[in-house]
């Protein structure tokens, strides 16, 4: 699909202070309502890794059949790393590579899962929210660790969950996706409701801690082996 990274940081002077200000402004554009088809055809998962001692950002994209959760396409995009890691500003470091990976997909996904925060973020604008606002695609953030808010530890069974609260408002879910594993931090990014983010993540879980879209993207981004593609994709 076609996309452009040119307008992503238009007007940003490169400073941390202005990046945080832009997050606060762009967070006003986030839509926390379900705008995903009841029967989507395609899902996508995205994750980022680094090469050359951090000098190159490596973004992985996996397109999946929404019904079978089998992978249809995998792509990797590489761009020079333009910013050091700053907590809470992950999208300013990784978004250009993610958008480059999105552009490699032959078809547009109906829903995107990103390894990172949605609105479960100090300024309610993590990388999944930023990605969604920039692309217009429904998005969900699935993170391995909490960045903001507090929660009561969910029960120990698969599917147990509890709300994550920040200043009295819910910003996400702590989800026990697999027994004896730490909970995932799940939150809507854009064009998905709070409940929708939880429901879609549960629908895409299999035998692993991570939902299939980000599990496969994580495997590709970290170069932990090849991904076998579905040889006869479902007719769309």
UniProtKB/Swiss-Prot annotation:
Pfam families xref list: Endonuclease_5
Signal peptide: none
Cofactor(s) the record lists: Mg(2+)
Catalytic activity reported: Endonucleolytic cleavage at apurinic or apyrimidinic sites to products with a 5'-phosphate
UniProt keywords, alphabetically: Cytoplasm, DNA damage, DNA repair, Endonuclease, Hydrolase, Magnesium, Metal-binding, Nuclease
Chief location bin: cytoplasm
Residues given in the record as Mg(2+) binding sites: 47, 115
Site (Interaction with target DNA): residue numbering on this chain: 85
Keyword Cytoplasm tagged: yes
GO function term, MF aspect, one: magnesium ion binding
Family designation: Belongs to the endonuclease V family.
Described function: DNA repair enzyme involved in the repair of deaminated bases. Selectively cleaves double-stranded DNA at the second phosphodiester bond 3' to a deoxyinosine leaving behind the intact lesion on the nicked DNA.
PANTHER family: ENDONUCLEASE V
Protein's recorded name: Endonuclease V
């Amino acid at each position: 699909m076609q996309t452009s990274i040119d307008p992503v940081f238009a007007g940003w002077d490169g400073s941390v202070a202005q990046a945080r200000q832009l997050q606060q402004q762009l967070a006003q554009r986030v839509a926390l309502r379900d705008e995903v088809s009841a029967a989507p055809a395609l899902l996508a998962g995205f994750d980022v890794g680094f090469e050359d001692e951090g000098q190159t950002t490596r973004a992985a994209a996996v397109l999946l059949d929404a019904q079978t959760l089998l992978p249809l396409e995998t792509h990797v995009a590489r761009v020079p790393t333009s910013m050091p890691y700053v907590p809470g500003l992950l999208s300013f470091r990784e978004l250009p590579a993610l958008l480059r990976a999105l552009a490699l997909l032959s078809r547009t996904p109906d829903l995107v899962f990103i390894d990172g925060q949605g609105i479960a973020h100090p300024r309610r604008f993590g990388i999944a929210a930023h990605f969604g606002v920039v692309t217009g695609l429904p998005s969900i953030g699935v993170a391995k660790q909490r960045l903001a808010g507090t929660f009561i530890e969910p029960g120990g069974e698969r599917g147990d969950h509890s709300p994550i609260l920040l200043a009295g408002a819910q910003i996400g879910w702590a989800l026990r996706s697999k027994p004896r594993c730490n909970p995932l931090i799940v939150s809507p990014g854009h064009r998905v409701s709070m409940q929708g983010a939880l429901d879609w993540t549960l629908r895409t879980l299999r035998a692993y801690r991570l939902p299939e879209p980000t599990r496969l993207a994580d495997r590709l981004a970290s170069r932990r082996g090849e991904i076998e593609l579905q040889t006869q994709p479902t007719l769309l």
